[in-house]
A protein has these predicted regions:
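Conserved catalytic core of two-component sensor histidine kinases
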Residues: 107, 114, 136, 143, ...
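Recognition helix of helix-turn-helix DNA-binding domains
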Residues: 151-191
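Hydrophobic "lid"/C-terminal helical patch
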Residues: 117, 146, 189
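N-terminal regulatory/sensing modules of transcriptional regulators
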Residues: 1-126
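Regulatory hinge/linker segments at domain boundaries
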Residues: 120-149, 154
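Hydrophobic packing within well-folded, soluble alpha/beta domains
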Residues: 3, 16, 50, 71, ...
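C-terminal edge and immediately downstream basic/flexible tail or linker adjoining helix-turn-helix-like DNA-binding
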Residues: 194-199
Length: 199
């Protein structure tokens, strides 16, 4: 397999590239860290798989997801797989919707990653999972208020609801986001775009 890896974190990208090239199944894994270099390298050779980081903010005005369709326009036979530390359903859903053949968590072991890449090279494609139930406007208000550090009694008073009703809303938020506590729910709500982080 010939793989083109685009990740804006140099230490991670260079290490992963060297690691993958140690596997017999991979003949080359060329690493790039910025978008200009990426398009140049993509155009001069044929690649079996393009492995893209979702978050490319440091080196690109686009996210990895934004690049998927552009890659297929230039190299329709190349398969695009996403690599990310953000294993959020909304990102996974959008990436697969735009044509990515797989969405791989950065926490995967080298062995798991190579197995996934081998499966991709043989035509395997991930299916789009169902998206989480969306938070209601009220639920988004609540999780945002929780992030400010207000007590549950203060939040209930501001929203003119009982504390019992507030707890019901909070439990619904946890269930929808797959969160175990308020901090995890708040961080996931930010990652999914339901609320913006406090500055």
């Amino acid at each position: 397999m010939k793989i083109l890896l685009f990740d804006d974190h140099r230490i991670f990208g260079e290490s992963l590239s060297k690691l993958l090239e140690d596997w017999d199944a991979i003949s080359i894994c060329h690493y790039v860290s910025n978008e200009t270099e990426f398009w140049n390298i993509l155009s001069v050779d044929e690649w079996d798989i393009v492995l893209l980081d979702v978050n490319l903010r440091d080196q690109s005005k686009n996210s990895g997801i934004d690049l998927i369709e552009k890659i297929y326009n230039k190299k329709p036979k190349t398969k695009v797989a996403m690599l990310s530390s953000y294993d959020m359903p909304v990102y996974r859903q959008e990436a697969l919707k735009r044509g990515a053949v797989s969405y791989i968590d950065k926490s995967a072991s080298a062995d798991e990653l190579v197995k996934k890449l081998t499966a991709i090279s043989k035509g395997h494609k991930s299916t789009t999972p169902p998206l989480l139930d969306p938070l209601t406007y009220r639920e988004a208000e609540i999780i945002k208020a929780i992030g400010t550090g207000k007590t549950k009694h203060e939040i209930a008073q501001e929203l003119y609801i009982s504390v019992r009703t507030l707890y019901n809303h909070i439990q619904s938020i946890y269930d929808k986001l797959g969160a175990k506590n308020a901090i995890e729910a708040y961080n996931k709500a930010i990652a999914l775009g339901y609320i913006t982080p406090l500055i």
